[in-house]
């Protein structure tokens, strides 16, 4: 609910909480399909006022066809037993299409318009497609190939080092060490050698989305 909140220029929903609540309310009525709800790890890290777990409990209590994702199941096994995925703009839209799994996105993402995600144009369209989710077919070979190509580009080729920012895992930040490294980088920084700046100039010149 708190990850990448301001990343999109458009969304079918006002915010992530609205998307979650309205989606849960809709799938509550779609009991011919089983729904697994996976909370985002940031819910616990950021100690949010309301969470995915509490919203599911409040809206979908006693709905046997809606369950929280079990903690004892490896995330890597998910593609083996799901038929579709739904996200507002999360990494599911990048990952699951690589396995041929049709995936809904309801806000702008870096994969918007690439041809392998389901992108409803309105809330009504979104809810209608959820109601008919059993009729949605697996992705074809061309779509799967496109998804894999993008995945490789995004996670491998786009990983450009930034000469001015010290690398540190966001989950274990040592602020004193971070600022010490930042000071050292700043003292020897030369923007003419910065690969990121060179790449951004090319992107701006070509008016590229990525």
Model segments located where?
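Conserved catalytic-core segment of nucleotide-activated headgroup transferases in glycan assembly
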Residues: 1-57
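Flexible loop/turn segments at secondary-structure boundaries
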Residues: 1-6, 42-47, 75-78, 93-95, ...
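Generic, well-ordered alpha-helical scaffold segments in large soluble proteins
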Residues: 22, 26-30, 59, 81, ...
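Nucleotide-activated donor-binding/catalytic signature segment of Leloir-type glycosyltransferases, i.e.
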Residues: 53-69
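Short acidic-hydrophobic, aromatic-tinged amphipathic segments that line or gate anion-handling sites
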Residues: 66-70, 117-129
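A donor-sugar binding/catalytic signature common to diverse glycosyltransferases
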Residues: 71-118
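C-terminal amphipathic helix plus adjacent low-complexity
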Residues: 124-210
